[in-house]
Amino acid sequence: AIAAVATLGSLLFGYDTGVISGALPYMYMPFDAKGLQLTSFEEGAIGGTLLVGAALGALLGGLMSDRWGRRHNITFLAFLFFAGAIGTTIAPNVWVMYPFRVVLGFAVGAASATVPVYLAETAPKRIRGSIVAIDQLMIVTGQLLAFSMNAIINSLQGGPKITIAEDPSGHFTPNTYAFDEIAKLQSSKGGPMSAEQYHAFLDQLSISAGNGEAWRYMLVLCSIPAVALWIGIRLMPESSRWYLAKERLYDAIGALKRVRVPEKDGSIEDEIMEMVEARQHEKDEESQRKGFSHVMATPWLRKLLLVGIFLAVVNQTTGVNTVMYYAPKVLEYAGMSTSASITAQVANGVMSVIGSAIGIWLILKFRRRQVLIGDVIGVGITLLGIAATFQFFIAPHMANHTTPPTWAAYLILGLMSVFMLIVQSSNGTIVWTMMGEIFPANVRGIMNGTAIFCMWTANAIITWTFPPMMETLGGGITYTIYGVLNLVVAVVLFKIMPETKDKSLEEIEVEM
């Protein structure tokens, strides 16, 4: 029951980061068609502001959890998930939406720092490993759920539509059109208009109707699991280990009794004694705990921190979130219709879930170093395949204002699906595992927090800059940059990445 309830936080993590991919095509519609008439910069900002909030949440979530308790913190985060979902849903424009995206992002980041700890501290030993692995699986399941709901809502809407009452420029007669027909006028999609000309064209249209509000239906669904999490977590006990950290022994015993079956999990008294001894050991460590200045003044720790930050950033330079957030828009650039691209995103979600399940097996069977380096090389090759498809089979048609062949868009989709399978099967799993292994206990908090903050910051930068890059540089150059970057990263990893599997901290220290 605890796993089912607590992992709703991870489901929300996945849902809130994934839902935007289907909402953006409707947000691009004109104001009079009930969209937000986004520019590429605003599109990037909608994704980026969530990740700025997530960086802050990851930085502060652990502190909040230590002060208030895991359960109370998750309860508060459920409220933030709900408030962020409702706020973004009713936002009349992007400037009102941005702060609510930051709130939503804060909940996402803080949940990433709190939920795994709560699960690890409350789960019985016999299922602890599988429950924490399920937590990671729930994130990608949440993204798949978001993609699926987006596809259903889009299908019910019949795709983005707009009714033009009058077009002074003479491009369109009064009628109802698929918004794709209007969007094709952009130079980035093979049309004759620059971004500025296109937005000026939209402003002069007289629009009588449109279904651009569909993005609101997609976003409001985020509130349902938030309510379920808020109700469910209030029925769960606090972490017994947190109670012990606060010297509340009797509360710790009571909490443990609620989540243990003595016939399966052994003596509660014995486990409490183990926890008391572990807590005493932690106190001894805390007396020796050092700060950030100690890390920077110690050469091997400083090098280890840089390796940890590099690993965290590598988790994002794969470009995984350019697919999670923007795949439908990328597929539109490749010539696929909006409706088809929103539905096609479900395939990426399925491959992501399969990849995450494979990752649980890979990390047990192979060495961390060889898996991650192989993953990054595979990612680089796949991204260069996407770049080549754009450059040689799509860009020439855009330049000539002709329609790219249908198979080219589906080739892009196929390469994206392979990309998601590769990146989710090893990159995230390896990076998160290694960051838990390479940092010494007396500085683990500050070093891990710094690395995670850098990861979310890199995520925000990539998410914010990707839409303008696609619009100005095109898919060929944009994906070439990411592909080459990953091959360079693979070389750097080969030179600096330590192997941590089956090694003690002392052995890692000698390597560094």
What are these regions (language model features)?
Residues 260:
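Short helix/loop segments within enzyme catalytic domains
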